[in-house]
Amino acid sequence: MSDRVNTTRLQEMARAYTVSAVLYAALDVGLFTHVSNGCVKEADLANATGLRRIDIDRLVSCALSLDLLDWDGEELRNQADVEAYLVEGKERYAGPWMMFTRPDVPGWFEMTERMRTPKSSRLGMYDDLTVESARQYHKATSSLSLIHI
C-alpha cells in the first residue's frame, strides 16, 4: 500500500455526474435492450437507436469503460447486472427506478445557492407531489420490488 497522496479520488468525485449521464443516455435510447435483443455491433446499434455512428461509438465506449457492456469476441454484450435489471421487458427491469430521480439532478448542482438563500430549502418531493408524479413514483418503486425475485 502506498502512502502517496494523489487527486484520483477527488477527480472521480468531481466527474461523477458523467457516470449518471452515460447511464441515462443509454437508458434513453434503449442501448441495453437493443444489445440483449441481438444488436451487438455498433452499426446495428446506430440504426436501432437512431444515433449517429460517432455518437453510438462514444456511448458504447463510455458504457464499456463503466463496465456496463463488455466484448464477447467481436460482439457486445451486457454485463450480468445490466442484463438482469436494465433490459426493458425483462421481469426484473429497474429502469423506471434508475430514471426516477433524474429530474432532481439540476437541483443538486444548485446546492450552494439553495443553502445560501435566507429561506430554508424544502427536502423531499411531497410538497409538489401531483397525481402524475405519484404514479411515476409508484411505477419506479414497484420496479424495485421485482429486483429480488
List the predicted regions and their residue ranges.
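Short N-terminal amphipathic alpha-helix/helix-capping patch enriched in small hydrophobics
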Residues: 27-28, 41
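Conserved Class I S-adenosyl-L-methionine-dependent methyltransferase catalytic core
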Residues: 13-17, 25-26, 33-34, 54-146
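Short, Lys/Arg-enriched N-terminal segment that forms or immediately precedes the first helix
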Residues: 6-20
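Short acidic, hydrophobic short linear motifs in intrinsically disordered regions
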Residues: 38-48
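Basic/polar N-terminal segments that are highly enriched at the extreme N-terminus
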Residues: 1-5
